[in-house]
């Protein structure tokens, strides 16, 4: 039974718990559990390096969900560099442990970036004001944690004067959740055969939220 839910900014002590959530959700393709752990941690470090806002859900003293967002390019230089360095160090460990799996992961990341850029080109949206990550432990789904985290990220962007927010998701994720919270799909990309070879989802989506409504 949940006795307490606390929402606060990300703390470095949350890193391992949040990375475990990402690992369980998206980073479990390798038979090597240690590699999966490193890959999830690398993904989280990347997201932290490109974000200027964080909110973590702490339930009974344990981090169980996170939202990250990016508003402009004018803050977080020091912490961004820290997480970029962390990402590089983790990539080095991944290459040493499982070079083939690491190469495939990097191919996937590059394909994802290309896809996201194509999606954004189809929309008049600015490149800033993005919800960069939303992840919630499966064990606490249905408790409203994701809703509170998403609302916190969107409210932060709005408080800085943003009139629109956007995010990327895909057919492997719970995209209907965003529609229930007012986001509208503005662009779709269907993966070609080469992209599918790199484990890209069948469809990738750009979602937009009007913050003036």
Predicted feature residues:
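Conserved acetyl-CoA-binding loop-helix of GNAT-fold acetyltransferases
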Residues: 136, 142-155, 180
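Conserved beta-strand-loop-alpha-helix junction that forms the acyl-donor binding cleft
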Residues: 132-141, 166-176, 191-195
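Conserved active-site alpha-helix within GNAT-family acetyltransferase domains
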Residues: 147, 171-188
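A short beta-loop-alpha structural element at the N-terminal edge
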Residues: 4-20, 71-72
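Conserved GNAT acetyl-CoA-binding A-motif
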Residues: 128-129, 157-170
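Helix-loop element at the rim of GNAT/NAT acetyltransferase active sites that forms part
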Residues: 20-36, 45-46, 71-74
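Conserved acyl-donor/pantetheine-binding loop and adjacent beta-alpha core of acyl/acetyltransferases
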Residues: 73-129, 193-200
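Active-site rim helix/loop that mediates acceptor-substrate recognition in acyltransferases
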Residues: 33-59, 64, 68, 89-92, ...
């Amino acid at each position: 039974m949940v006795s307490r839910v606390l929402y606060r900014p990300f703390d470095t002590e949350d890193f391992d718990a949040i990375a475990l959530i990402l690992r369980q959700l998206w980073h479990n393709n390798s038979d090597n559990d240690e590699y999966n752990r490193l890959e999830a941690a690398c993904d989280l470090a990347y997201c932290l390096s490109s974000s200027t806002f964080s909110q973590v859900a702490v339930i009974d003293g344990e981090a169980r969900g996170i939202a990250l967002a990016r508003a402009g390019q004018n803050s977080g230089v020091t912490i961004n560099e820290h997480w970029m360095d962390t990402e590089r160090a983790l990539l080095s460990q991944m290459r040493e442990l499982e070079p083939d799996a690491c190469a495939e992961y990097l191919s996937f990341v590059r394909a994802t970036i290309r896809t996201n850029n194509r999606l954004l080109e189809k929309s008049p949206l600015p490149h800033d004001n993005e919800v960069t990550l939303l992840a919630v432990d499966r064990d606490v789904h249905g408790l409203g944690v994701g809703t509170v985290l998403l609302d916190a990220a969107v409210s932060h962007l709005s408080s800085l004067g943003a009139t629109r927010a956007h995010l990327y998701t895909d057919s492997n994720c719970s995209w209907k959740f965003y529609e229930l919270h007012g986001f509208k799909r503005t662009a779709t990309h269907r993966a070609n055969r080469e992209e599918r070879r790199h484990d890209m989802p069948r469809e990738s989506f750009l979602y937009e939220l009007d913050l003036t409504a």
